[in-house]
């Protein structure tokens, strides 16, 4: 259960907040929607906020626009890969969410999964793909069916299922367009879930039911046939299990502030961590606000909680 948090509104109302959104990644349009929603929430709470498209990022380094805290609403490379976090640290500007090193680790599926394998956090078997690989051998080694993913893209961009060598070769080419590193994961066939984390506490899990082959970009942002079940319907024991696993995965990367952990059950029902999102979407369709609402936290309060959690 999420604890009540007393928000220091007097403190926040005296600050100048920059909302960094947009950017140049493949998730730009989603980031624009997230930033606008955050801006509306802060404005409604009387907080002095400025929207800054990352393409115009020179502004927040300019003396003409002094900012106390940056609310990072950038998704994907350029926002979740540690680049902007390192820059803000150089400028000594405080910001929401995880630090640069944690962001770099979380955005890389192969690096984070390698760590989880080492410390016993359950995640699907995987292999980094190369153009010279024997696709049939690779497929056999991962159980005969795989999900191919770009290493550092979010929102399921560039992901493809493969059930034979020809499909695997094609899937590799698709993913390679989005990332220099491509991985193949053993196919997980159980239900998909996500667990949001706010100030080191877990929010109720969400079960995702997609009408498409898998929960892809279209299903996430444009489909009316994707169902989000929250609370997810898990038993109390299973809910505790998935929340503990999500929190362990999050903390193992030294992530902080807020984030979302995506998981999927295997054929035996065991939960497997897919990835950690260090800057979850904050649109009307986004999962983080849905989980917060299930915990009794409305959107405006959620935004204030994230902002108030930035260390003074």
What is each stretch, according to the model?
Residues 84-89, 214-222, 278:
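Short, flexible, mixed-charge acidic loops at enzyme active sites
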